[in-house]
């Protein structure tokens, strides 16, 4: 069963969209290093202007293994601190979903 993790953020007033995307690219490198398939989305309908950082895994066990590695990686913590300090976005929501085969 596949797993997807999504982090939705809203740009803060006055934030540079290019800087937001660059920060997401840095995060994507870390997630990919630990096995995630990363994509980045701009919301066009509904919560227009928000961004979605999405990470897919082939299975729940692959997701769990990646999370263990991410939490132990100093690069993850450094990137999180950099992201918070930059103040470019505000967290909207996070989701972790498992695929239902139909």
Regions flagged by a language model, labelled:
Residues 1-78, 82-102:
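Short S/T/G/P-rich N-terminal loop/turn motif that feeds into the first structured element of a domain
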């Amino acid at each position: 069963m596949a797993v997807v993790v999504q982090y939705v953020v809203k740009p803060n007033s006055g934030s540079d969209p290019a800087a937001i995307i660059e920060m997401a690219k840095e995060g994507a490198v870390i997630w990919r290093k630990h096995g995630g398939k990363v994509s980045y989305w701009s919301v066009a309908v509904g919560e227009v202007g928000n961004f979605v950082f999405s990470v897919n895994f082939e299975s729940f066990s692959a997701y769990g293994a990646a999370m263990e590695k991410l939490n132990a990686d100093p690069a993850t913590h450094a990137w999180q601190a950099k992201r918070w300090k930059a103040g470019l976005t505000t967290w909207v929501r996070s989701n972790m979903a498992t695929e239902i085969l139909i």
